[in-house]
Amino acid sequence: MGTVTYRPRAGAVLFGAVSLDRYIDEGLVLPGGGALNMAWHWSRSGFPFRLLSRVGDDSPGLFAGFLERHHIDHSAASFFGSGASASIDIVTREDRQPAMDNYVEGVWAGFRLDSGGEAAIAGAGCLHVVLVDPVVREIHRIGEAGMLAGADVSADFLDFRHYDEDRFAATMRHVDTGFVGWPGEPGHPTVAGLRRVAFGLGRLVIVTLGPRGILVFDGKAGRELSVPVNAIPVLGTTVGCGDAFIAAYLSARWRGEGLETALERARLAGAEATAWRRPLPDEAY
């Protein structure tokens, strides 16, 4: 983690878990996970990157087909391992929003980047990570080893369910930009803690609040923004909004666009995703 580099030396690297999404009430299994969703968005927009992740040998064709169809750069030798893929059970509630439970780490239990993955990260100008526990451990390890020096690092803290202020600060020491999809009110003490970390460490923290807008704590520039959004009818679900938002924001920023322009692109991308019943449109699968 170091000074911001908006034009990657060798493209960006995307690092995070992918999983088997088991739609229980439909008897359907689809490739999923925040990193895979991000990869689809970046591939669609033409943003150059390499995906670092791992799946097991239980459903390799499901993932291989997705990667090939969408021309997602990856190392097959590192991506496809042995054992069970990570998985999660999804049930669609009456309000059409997904309820997720029974996450199984599979090949991510005890995960460690191989030498190729470490080299890819060490050589990249930009790195985005989707934080589940095994990824958090690796970011701390490689950050403390100096492998993030010179890279612009961003991280998706998801809905902050497994974090508190101290743990957030420990991870943000290795990160330049943090994203939090906060499900509560903007006045909650947790949000105040996000602000303290951003300004205490001189980091950028972007908090999405759904129809309540976006909070930006720019500890680097010593400013904060409250960005309103226009509430729109949700025709599908909101499950894919966060990935769409972050993908659009980062591709804009890392191509040299300003903060406000990137936020507007991200807002529009997040709104588009509310028309989908899954994290991605049906045709993506």
Per-range role (PLM):
Residues 2-14, 65-69, 74-79, 92-224, ...:
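Ribokinase/PfkB-type carbohydrate-kinase core domain
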Residues 2-8, 191-285:
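Conserved phosphate-binding/catalytic region of the ribokinase-like
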Residues 8-11, 15, 20-88, 94-95, ...:
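Substrate-binding N-lobe of the ribokinase-like
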Residues 17, 21, 156, 237, ...:
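Acidic active-site catalytic centers that drive phospho-/nucleotidyl reactions
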Residues 19-23, 160, 232-234:
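A short, flexible beta-alpha/helix-coil linker loop
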Residues 20, 44-47, 72, 180, ...:
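Generic secondary-structure signature for well-ordered alpha-helical cores
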Residues 29, 54-55, 133, 240, ...:
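Residue-level marker of alpha-helix boundaries and capping positions
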Residues 59-61, 84-86, 164, 215-216, ...:
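Short secondary-structure boundary/hinge segments and terminal tails
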